[in-house]
């Protein structure tokens, strides 16, 4: 999953009919090992234990990923039923059919990366580091408590909201874990919050505000740059300067881009800031992965770019997942296995590596804490960008959700 942004990042895998043969199961790069996934299916939203009543609740929004192979079908079913992500004819009937048909294929892919997605594990670790820092930096708004709200797997966004209400949270911050905004990822998560209250016909007990995008936050940029430099240093010294950096993000259909989705521009802004931080040390390109179907999508595609570079004698390549902060199937399977192992061998790549995702980097938790702290100090409900609908938006719920959040009043 449009990653139609991150949700379509995964959609690329879900709809793909071709499989790669001869895959090896271990992580190819020494810099980012695949973590084992706990085999749990707790139906309750996850929040860290804390005896104190939380004053500020931070809802960490993401699409999520199946922790176990048994979770895959439910994940796919919720994904295909999400009308913010895609609209299908007779969606309530077609979605279960597609989910059932695709489950074995996607289970096979997850089995090659350890049996499930590590995204919940990383989100927990990031959240714990974030609230610990916030309690130290902002005692006036403490205790702080993080909650995880996934769109397609437990803990679901709606269940997390219920947990926050029961905890008596006074101030709720909807904090997207997508640095770059897209209507079908961050937008879908925010729509889910609005739909929750709209279905109940009640106003929130909590006062909501939103961190809806952060593509150029200085600490985010530093994290990316540090991870890239670390991986560049692993290339042979005589090849290091000619390594081509391919920043890879999930592609979007041009029909979505042409409606005015800001995702491509925001991803580009992240890339520009990262390369500035690196002093433009290497040639680079922004490329797009997970294209689905015959329609026009943002390009060039990551796999085609690898092929094209090799044909032109550029055979030292560093892949950088620039729109993904935590490892999941698109980094661990698509980038690490399909591209860095299978495709690279076919193309005759000399050296190919993948920059480690931000995962458990303490500096990244510091970035998250800084974003929340700055947001609370600003007293802003959301960014000015969030109040603006895409010029050619076709989803009326987007307008209703934006109105819901912009009308929230902070105490």
From Swiss-Prot:
It catalyses: heme b + 2 H(+) = protoporphyrin IX + Fe(2+). Its cofactor is [2Fe-2S] cluster. Binds 1 [2Fe-2S] cluster. The keyword Iron-sulfur applies. Residues 41-51 have a biased composition (Basic and acidic residues). Residues 34-55 are annotated as: Disordered. Protoporphyrin IX binds at residues 102, 110, 117. It comes from the Eukaryota. Pfam families: Ferrochelatase. One of its GO terms (cellular component) is mitochondrion. The keyword Cell membrane does not apply. One of its GO terms (biological process) is heme biosynthetic process. InterPro entries: Ferrochelatase (IPR001015), Ferrochelatase_AS (IPR019772), Ferrochelatase_C (IPR033644), Ferrochelatase_N (IPR033659). [2Fe-2S] cluster binds at residues 183, 390, 393, 398. Pathway: Porphyrin-containing compound metabolism; protoheme biosynthesis; protoheme from protoporphyrin-IX: step 1/1. Its EC number is 4.98.1.1. Keywords: 2Fe-2S, Heme biosynthesis, Iron, Iron-sulfur, Lyase, Membrane, Metal-binding, Mitochondrion, Mitochondrion inner membrane, Porphyrin biosynthesis, Transit peptide. It is found in: Mitochondrion inner membrane. Catalyzes the ferrous insertion into protoporphyrin IX. Belongs to the ferrochelatase family. PANTHER family: FERROCHELATASE, FERROCHELATASE, MITOCHONDRIAL. NCBIfam families: hemH (TIGR00109). HAMAP family: Ferrochelatase (MF_00323). Homodimer. Homotetramer. This is Ferrochelatase, mitochondrial. It comes from Xenopus laevis (African clawed frog). The gene is fech.
